[in-house]
């Protein structure tokens, strides 16, 4: 692969008629990192990805730079970016190898080099035995690997993912997420990955940019986003939270994660509560504990522990577990 580059966005924004899809923002994607754009539907993450790719233009005076080159006015075919879509965007009349080779053929890459690159990419995504298979004979996961191989074959400066795993079943999605993460680390290519799935974001991102209503609301490492969320929206969107203190005057409320609650079936902890329900999650269980607030809090416990509805408990928080936000 080519040497990794930095991607810099300066005062980029996008408005469609009277609707603001993306408020002005500055953002830098470091060379060789995977930056995940995370947020709910309609938050502006795909618009931002399309601006980076050249499929959309930023409203003036927004600029996009690849290292020291201003690519703002360049269309997608001049930016040398690779894109992987949710719907694969493969050609059904071409076989696996022909799909991977298509972009190289359009670029005028000589046949010998083209064949060598196709072989290299198919080996990279473990599809060599399927080189001559028809696209309609592939599974969803295999199709997404073909799409990834095709994007990488042109040796792009930047690799862009638009929710590539959203259409797959849960088990396949988990496996491909691991494979894509390992591949991105191995290639050390600059990548931007769009998703609404916080587990995907945590697993793949070197950093995560959380977006809300067209705004970038927090940019941090996965650990920073989860452990030090900048707002209640971020805390709520990335994992579960409990409200453990109400303040009707609008002062900061206190929250905690389900795994940060200490629980005992005796009186060792200062706070009291009652188990009102539980959900089995495989290796763990999620308990609902009534602590006298409007809603019960959630507590994460090992699945082998036995807790009964109606059981009285004591509880506390791990040190420095509480989060505070102004609401």
Model segments located where?
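Conserved structural motif at the start of ABC-family nucleotide-binding domains
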Residues: 7, 22-24
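The feature captures the beta-strand-to-loop junction immediately N-terminal to the Walker
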Residues: 38-40
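ABC ATPase nucleotide-binding domain helices that frame the ATP-binding cleft
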Residues: 46-49, 146
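Helix-to-loop junction immediately C-terminal to a conserved catalytic motif
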Residues: 53
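Conserved ABC transporter NBD signature motif
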Residues: 61-70
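ABC ATPase nucleotide-binding domains
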Residues: 76-82, 86, 90-230
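Non-catalytic connector elements of ABC transporters
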Residues: 251-327
């Amino acid at each position: 692969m080519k040497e990794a580059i930095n991607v810099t966005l300066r005062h980029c924004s996008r408005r469609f008629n009277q609707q603001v899809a993306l408020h002005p923002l500055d953002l830098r994607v470091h060379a060789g990192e995977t930056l995940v754009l995370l947020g709910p539907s309609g938050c502006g993450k795909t618009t931002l990805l399309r601006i980076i790719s050249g499929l959309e233009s930023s409203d003036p005076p927004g600029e996009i730079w690849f290292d020291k080159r201003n690519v703002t006015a360049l269309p997608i075919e001049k930016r040398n970016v690779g894109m992987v879509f949710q719907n694969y965007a493969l050609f059904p009349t071409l076989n696996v190898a022909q799909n991977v080779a298509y972009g190289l053929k359009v670029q005028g890459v000589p046949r010998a080099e083209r064949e060598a690159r196709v072989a290299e990419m198919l080996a990279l995504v473990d599809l060599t035995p399927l080189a001559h298979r028809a696209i309609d004979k592939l599974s969803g996961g295999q199709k997404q690997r073909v799409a990834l191989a095709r994007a990488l074959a042109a040796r792009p400066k930047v690799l862009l993912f638009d929710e590539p795993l959203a259409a797959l079943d849960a088990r396949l999605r988990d496996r491909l997420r691991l494979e894509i993460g390992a591949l991105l680390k191995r290639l050390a290519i600059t990548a931007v990955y769009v998703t609404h799935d916080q587990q995907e974001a945590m697993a793949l991102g070197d950093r995560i940019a959380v977006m809300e209503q067209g705004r970038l609301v927090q940019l941090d490492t996965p650990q920073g986003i989860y452990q030090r969320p900048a707002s209640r929206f971020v805390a709520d969107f990335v994992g579960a939270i409990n409200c453990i203190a109400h303040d009707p005057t609008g002062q900061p409320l206190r929250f905690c994660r389900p795994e940060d609650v200490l629980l005992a079936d005796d009186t060792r902890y200062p706070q009291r509560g009652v188990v009102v329900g539980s959900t089995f999650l495989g290796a763990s269980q999620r308990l609902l504990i009534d602590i006298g607030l409007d809603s019960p809090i959630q507590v994460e416990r090992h699945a082998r522990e036995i807790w009964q509805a109606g059981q009285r408990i004591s509880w506390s928080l791990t040190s420095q577990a509480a989060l505070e936000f102004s609401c």
